């Protein structure tokens, strides 16, 4: 009997269909238990009997609370600042400045620091706002290009950045003969006056050509045999012409009277570059020295600048008269102040990146701290500088000798004259320095460039003994009339006689 019970228990275990003691309930058991729910209470039963005859309006078991909707308009109390108007660097500076002691400064020093801040930052730090409520972000300074400008600026693209489709003649408007012009890279032999008179130095003579009437006049001829004219420069306002000679003289001529007013001798070598700053005439010599002449007084030589070891072949005053740029055969570019500092006449900046002689020197007319320079055959580069920070803003390989650079304020462009191998003039777009056009026609290297007073015509003197006039910056009639009205309203700044 015991054996039968043992076999029966063994058989039931092997079948595996009997419930396992203390095992968790099966899934179907759990579902059935959940569907049955808790035992109904009397209150819940009464409510169920009261609503048994009503059709449910929603899915059973779903909450009858009102659905939340998104408001049609956001609240008016949320402030989102413009990123372009949040100047974090200025904010950090202003916050840290509060903890510093206030050092009293003279009004002159404050004005000087304000000018530096405007040139470096593009805005006045003292008047800058950290966060500003505004409808549109402020425009970038004119001539300034960055990738964020496209993203944050909502204003129309300025004319300097907009692509132009103007017609640029590829042929010169007029060709004049320039016999016996000296083929010397270091000389500055042409200049155009505000009275629309072009002065050209041909060996030992200076000729004047009136662009208005076409008349030609010989102003002077050197007295000593072997002497020649090495530079010419018109005063900005007036009828006076400065002439530099190979005999180290600087002559001053009254063009209307065709009379030499004075002969200034302070250099020891030929004078290859001249430039005016009101009544101050600056002259650069082969000795490497720059002299300032006050043409109003008898003792004209008022300053000597010694920053070059070889000939000074490029000399330009800034439009505001605060800086003088000089380029030399020693591959240097110096930026000088208009007045001596505590240490005397010391350059504010010295640029050494050029690998050749620097004759092409030109200041930007609408940005007084921007300077363009061009190198000779060993360098062949055009470089744009910020003279306040000393940074090189851009550099472009011109693939040939750069003899001269001019700025066009009408179209925000530059034009440069070149030597071998194509002897061409090249127009560049600023600040991208993209090539706009090439003007070819000279059969020898270009020596000098000068621009007409209306800014529409460029005259190029070359070693092929020709003077070519290019109307490459012609204005439309409306803009020309506006410029003529502005020019007529200006009065002359020269009220003192030159003696």
UniProtKB/Swiss-Prot annotation:
One of its GO terms (cellular component) is spindle pole. The modification Phosphothreonine is found at residues 70, 106, 157. Pathway: Protein modification; protein ubiquitination. It is found in: Cytoplasm, Cytoskeleton, Microtubule organizing center, Centrosome; Chromosome, Centromere, Kinetochore; Cytoplasm, Cytoskeleton, Spindle pole. The modification Phosphoserine is found at residues 41, 72, 92, 153, 161. The modification N6-acetyllysine is found at residue 66. One of its GO terms (molecular function) is anaphase-promoting complex binding. Coiled coil: none annotated. InterPro entries: Cdc20/Fizzy, WD40/YVTN_repeat-like_dom_sf, WD40_CDC20-Fz, WD40_repeat_dom_sf, WD40_rpt. WD repeats lie at residues 182-221, 224-263, 266-303, 307-346, 353-395, 397-438, 441-480. It comes from the Eukaryota. Keywords: Acetylation, Cell cycle, Cell division, Centromere, Chromosome, Cytoplasm, Cytoskeleton, Isopeptide bond, Kinetochore, Mitosis, Phosphoprotein, Repeat, Ubl conjugation, Ubl conjugation pathway, WD repeat. Phosphorylated during mitosis. Phosphorylated by BUB1 at Ser-41; Ser-72; Ser-92; Ser-153; Thr-157 and Ser-161. Phosphorylated by NEK2. The keyword Kinase does not apply. Residues 61-72 have a biased composition (Polar residues). Residues 20-81 are annotated as: Disordered. One of its GO terms (biological process) is positive regulation of synaptic plasticity. There is a cross-link at residues 485, 490 (Glycyl lysine isopeptide (Lys-Gly) (interchain with G-Cter in ubiquitin)). Substrate-specific adapter of the anaphase promoting complex/cyclosome (APC/C) complex that confers substrate specificity by binding to substrates and targeting them to the APC/C complex for ubiquitination and degradation. Recognizes and binds the destruction box (D box) on protein substrates. Involved in the metaphase/anaphase transition of cell cycle. Is regulated by MAD2L1: in metaphase the MAD2L1-CDC20-APC/C ternary complex is inactive and in anaphase the CDC20-APC/C binary complex is active in degrading substrates. Belongs to the WD repeat CDC20/Fizzy family. Component of a complex with CDC20, CDC27, SPATC1 and TUBG1. Interacts with NEUROD2. Interacts with dimeric MAD2L1 in its closed conformation form. Interacts with BUB1B. The phosphorylated form interacts with APC/C. Interacts with NINL. May interact with MAD2L2. Interacts with CDK5RAP2. Interacts with SIRT2. Interacts with isoform 1 of NEK2. Interacts with HSF1 (via phosphorylated form); this interaction occurs in mitosis in a MAD2L1-dependent manner and prevents PLK1-stimulated degradation of HSF1 by blocking the recruitment of the SCF(BTRC) ubiquitin ligase complex. This is Cell division cycle protein 20 homolog. It comes from Sus scrofa (Pig). The gene is CDC20.
């Amino acid at each position: 009997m015991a054996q039968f019970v043992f076999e029966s228990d063994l058989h039931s275990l092997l079948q595996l269909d009997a419930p396992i003691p203390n095992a968790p309930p099966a899934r179907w058991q759990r579902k059935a238990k959940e569907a049955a729910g808790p035992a109904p209470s009397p209150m819940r039963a009464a409510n169920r009997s009261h609503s048994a005859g009503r059709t449910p309006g929603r899915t059973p078991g779903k909450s009858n609370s009102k659905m939340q909707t998104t408001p049609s308009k956001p609240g008016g109390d949320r402030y989102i600042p413009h990123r372009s108007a949040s100047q974090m660097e200025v904010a950090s500076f202003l916050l840290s400045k509060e903890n510093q002691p206030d050092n009293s400064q003279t009004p002159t020093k404050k004005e000087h620091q304000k000018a530096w801040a405007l040139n470096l930052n593009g805005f006045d730090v003292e008047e800058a706002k950290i966060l500003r409520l505004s409808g549109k972000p402020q425009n970038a300074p004119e001539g300034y290009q960055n990738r964020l400008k496209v993203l944050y600026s909502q204003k129309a693209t300025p004319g300097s950045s907009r692509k132009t489709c103007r017609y640029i003649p590829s042929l010169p408007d007029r060709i004049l003969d320039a016999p016996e012009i000296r083929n010397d890279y270091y000389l500055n032999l042409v200049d155009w006056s505000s009275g629309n008179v072009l002065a050209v130095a041909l060996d030992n003579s200076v000729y004047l050509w009136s662009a208005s009437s076409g008349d030609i006049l010989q102003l002077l001829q050197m007295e000593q045999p072997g002497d020649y004219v090495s530079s010419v420069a018109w005063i900005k306002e007036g009828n006076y012409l400065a002439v530099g000679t190979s005999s180290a003289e600087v002559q001053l001529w009254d063009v209307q009277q065709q009379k030499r007013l004075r002969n200034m001798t302070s250099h020891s070598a030929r004078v290859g570059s001249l430039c005016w700053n009101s009544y101050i005439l600056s002259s650069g010599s082969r000795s490497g020295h720059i002299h300032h002449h006050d043409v109003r007084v008898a003792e004209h030589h008022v300053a000597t600048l010694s920053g070059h070891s070889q000939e000074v072949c490029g000399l330009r005053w800034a439009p505001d008269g605060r800086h003088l740029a000089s380029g030399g055969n020693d591959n240097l570019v110096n930026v000088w102040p208009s007045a001596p500092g505590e240490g005397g006449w010391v350059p504010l900046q010295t640029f050494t990146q050029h690998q050749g002689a620097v004759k092409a020197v030109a200041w930007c007319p609408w940005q007084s701290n921007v300077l363009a320079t061009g190198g000779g055959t060993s360098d062949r580069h055009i470089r744009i500088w910020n003279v306040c920070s000393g940074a090189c803003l851009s550099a472009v390989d011109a693939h040939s000798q750069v003899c001269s650079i001019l700025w066009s304020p009408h179209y925000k462009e530059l034009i440069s004259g070149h030597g071998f191998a194509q002897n061409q003039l090249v127009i560049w777009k600023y600040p991208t320095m993209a090539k706009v056009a090439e003007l070819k026609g000279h059969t020898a290297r270009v020596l000098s460039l000068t621009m007409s007073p209306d800014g529409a015509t460029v005259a190029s003197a070359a070693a092929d003994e020709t003077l070519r006039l290019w109307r490459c910056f012609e204005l439309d009639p409306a803009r020309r009339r506006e410029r003529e009205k502005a020019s007529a309203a200006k009065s002359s700044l020269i009220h003192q006689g030159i003696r």
